[in-house]
Amino acid sequence: MISDIPKVGQKLSDILSEKFTYEDLRARDKISKEKRSLRNLIKEMEDEVLASAGVDSFEEIFKLIFTKLYDELICANDKTAYLKFRNSGDTDFELKEKIQGLFDDAKKKWEGVFSDESKILLSPSHLAVCVSTLQDIKLFNNNLDVVDDAFEYLMSKAQKGEKGQYFTPRYVIDMCVKMMNPTVNDKIIDTACGSSGFTVHSIFKVWKEIRLSKGLEPGEDFTASERTADERDFVRDNVFAIDFDEKTVRVARTLNLIAGDGQTNVLHLNTLDYSRWNEVTKQEDWNDTYNEGFKKLKKLQPKGSSDFSKFHFDLVMANPPFAGDIKEQTILSHYELAKNDKGKWQKKVGRDILFIERNLNFLKPGGRMAVVLPQGRFNNSSDKYIRDFIAERCRILAVVGLHGNVFKPHTGTKTSVLFVQKWDDKLCPQKEDYPIFFATMQKPSKDNSGEKIYVKDGNGEILLDHHNHFIVEHDLYNHDGMTQDGIAEAFVEFAKKEGLSFFQ
């Protein structure tokens, strides 16, 4: 058509460029339409492009996901806007310029994840292939699974599983959230946050309650739409997360910034080595990024305490690293569990053991905790002193045994989730004899190679929920009324019968 001849100042790409809205992306989304996973698309990108690109795969893919999330956010909130994260008609050099500009805008929107000077390092031709691969994937979805799956893959490659640090599957997190029942008044922290799943899913649960209390539609969870003031305030004032790994913290901050509409208290600190926090937090670079959140965390110390040894949280949920021992005496000297059952200091102590004590010290009286631990801590006769330590300080609410495939392919270590509530005269009066809820996960949720097993319909087709997401086959809870009640529902019934304070 004559009208399509470029005007003065227009490039050919301006004419060829496909006008593509967020609604178009929803309709074309490869994940729901072709049943592709972002993890597998990234693997393909690595094999075809990144292996020969001479760049840090984690950093460059992180930049692209970060940029694409920003592009989706802008277009979801402005129905007339067109997505820019697309390869349609641009030369490779024009595309790189466009994507770099988008990345720069994203950095301004979500500060403290990438430095101001950070650039996309992929060559124009490599970037063009990567953008084409990612452009028809909708990253904003209901439950973070899409993005989280990709980040877990990238992190596991970057870290090679050092320190036994693996992301907790979202279905395990959701079970814990349903059983611990966070509310709008709770102060919540994850002390070994990984990608921050426990806190983000707690946010989703509380947001639903806030919206329902105001007569609003619950809406999507991890969504591009704006939040109410009450929803933002909850994230700003009540939700915290800590991790010692800088890359992990940046991923967690990204997900929290987006889910929390610009609010985040994710901090780069060594949870166990709190005697050095004063030293770490005085560093200028650290301060620029994390000071706002740290000031709020300091206020949650009990009266008269200022050494970061104790805090006043209502709820701690965590999956601490369970590989490797702590040998530094400067750290061990702060922990009672660093002594053996005869009261003598040990030369080395399992990291997860110290996390048990540290997590309990984050809780106020009546506070509750869900923590993933190696199964041996519940059975080994040599670990009896740990079980005694917990029982003296808390009511043991529940122990849920997870299937051995849950953390595959990273590890086949058998794990259980421990749920406790700290003794308190009002919320959890001390008693010697009380029932404990025990359950064991029967459905593996993953096959032996670590691939998720999905629920299928009567024709053998993978079943999609009403958000167009796959449903992992497990027996931890009922998935939006589409699967049977599971362990979480049975615990809620138990908790109400027992009159537990957080279900009254």
List each language-model region with its residue ranges:
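A conserved structural/catalytic subdomain of Rossmann-like adenosyl-cofactor enzymes
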Residues: 5-24, 274, 280-504
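Class I SAM-dependent transferase core
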Residues: 45, 146-171, 177-180
